[in-house]
Amino acid sequence: MLTWLSRTDFDFPPLDKALQEPNGLLAAGGDLNPQRLVAAYRHGCFPWYQDGQPILWWSPDPRTVLFPDELHVSRSLAKCLRQQRFEVTFNRDFRAVIQACAAPRDYADGTWITTPMQLAYQELHLRGIAHSVEVWQERQLVGGLYGLAMGRLFFGESMFSRADNASKVGFVTLVRHLRDAGFVLIDCQMPTRHLHSLGARAISRGEFADYLQRYRDQPPTGDLDF
């Protein structure tokens, strides 16, 4: 049975209560209060819903993750990085990045990054929890991504690209930065060919929960310097 959250209770049900179909649906309702969002990621779930739906909270099994030491950079991408076609920055324009991620795409019907979602994550950014990666070409924003940093874990949310390899360059730059700071895992949530080509793989929900328990409160071992 699906758990419905109240606006005053920030506790989520155990992850093993998530539905098998649809895979990983854990709870519905509640709100996008910053405290609830932080509690969700610490617990191992995330919001994902369309306009007109209640807020839906997910913890899929398996979970797609990337371990920084397993990052795969293809020859063509390595060449692109060496050519320095792009400038990559952190936290220069979070709002522009999340708005670009929310923009309609040819292969998708609508967007799950609703206006309330954008405002909620912008608030997390102001609190130093959510971060953006911007990829620039000739002073134009051509790619980027955003996510949350907690302890030695990074929770990726969405990325976009307006130029060939732009989002990949931003992602690789972020992963290398996180690796140098001692991060142990990047949560990619759901599988895509794009992410698998960069080294992401699936682990069980239980294994993901173990990483959460161990690393969500550990400070980075290196200079994060976002």
Swiss-Prot record:
Record InterPro entries: Acyl_CoA_acyltransferase, Leu/Phe-tRNA_Trfase, Leu/Phe-tRNA_Trfase_C, Leu/Phe-tRNA_Trfase_N
Signal peptide: none
Record's subcellular location: Cytoplasm
Enzyme superclass (EC): transferase
Catalytic reaction annotation: N-terminal L-lysyl-[protein] + L-leucyl-tRNA(Leu) = N-terminal L-leucyl-L-lysyl-[protein] + tRNA(Leu) + H(+); N-terminal L-arginyl-[protein] + L-leucyl-tRNA(Leu) = N-terminal L-leucyl-L-arginyl-[protein] + tRNA(Leu) + H(+); L-phenylalanyl-tRNA(Phe) + an N-terminal L-alpha-aminoacyl-[protein] = an N-terminal L-phenylalanyl-L-alpha-aminoacyl-[protein] + tRNA(Phe)
EC number(s) given by UniProt: 2.3.2.6
UniProt KW keywords: Acyltransferase, Cytoplasm, Transferase
GO biological process: protein catabolic process
Pfam family, one: Leu_Phe_trans
SUPFAM superfamilies according to UniProt: Acyl-CoA N-acyltransferases (Nat)
Cellular component aspect of the GO annotation: cytoplasm
A molecular-function term among this protein's GO annotations: leucyl-tRNA--protein transferase activity
Purpose: Functions in the N-end rule pathway of protein degradation where it conjugates Leu, Phe and, less efficiently, Met from aminoacyl-tRNAs to the N-termini of proteins containing an N-terminal arginine or lysine.
Family: Belongs to the L/F-transferase family.
Protein name per the record: Leucyl/phenylalanyl-tRNA--protein transferase
Organism: Pseudomonas aeruginosa (strain LESB58)
